[in-house]
């Protein structure tokens, strides 16, 4: 939607009054970030969240001339914990690959109707 917002407002001053912009559910590519920064200097919040949780379990805040962090999903949102675990559900050391697990009140307890 950030892409659509920027495209719809191209060549206008419609976005000039924005103080904060939140986007999530899409990859913040270097090109999209550059388009945003070339148009606005406002604070940009980029959120990450898996479908099993919510639109945002973590976020990155880009203020002023902050550079885009290529591989970061940011810090956990309040009341949320994020863990990288191995196949045996044990935490892995920093820099070691694993599966991302989220915990906290934003996480659903399961499906209303479990998939078949």
Locate each region found by the language model.
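AMP-dependent adenylate-forming
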Residues: 42-46, 61-116
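Activation segment
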Residues: 5-6, 32, 93, 111
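Conserved AMP-binding
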Residues: 1, 51, 104
């Amino acid at each position: 939607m950030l892409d659509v917002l920027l495209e719809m407002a191209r060549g206008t001053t419609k976005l000039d009054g924005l103080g904060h912009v939140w986007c999530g559910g899409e990859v913040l590519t270097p090109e999209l970030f550059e388009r945003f920064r070339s148009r606005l200097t406002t604070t940009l919040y980029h959120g990450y969240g898996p479908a099993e949780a919510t639109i945002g379990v973590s976020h990155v805040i880009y203020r002023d001339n902050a550079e885009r962090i290529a591989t970061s999903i940011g810090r956990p949102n309040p009341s949320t914990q994020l863990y990288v675990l191995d196949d045996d559900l044990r935490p892995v050391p920093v820099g070691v690959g694993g599966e991302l697990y989220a915990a906290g009140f934003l996480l659903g307890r399961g499906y209303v109707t479990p998939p078949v």
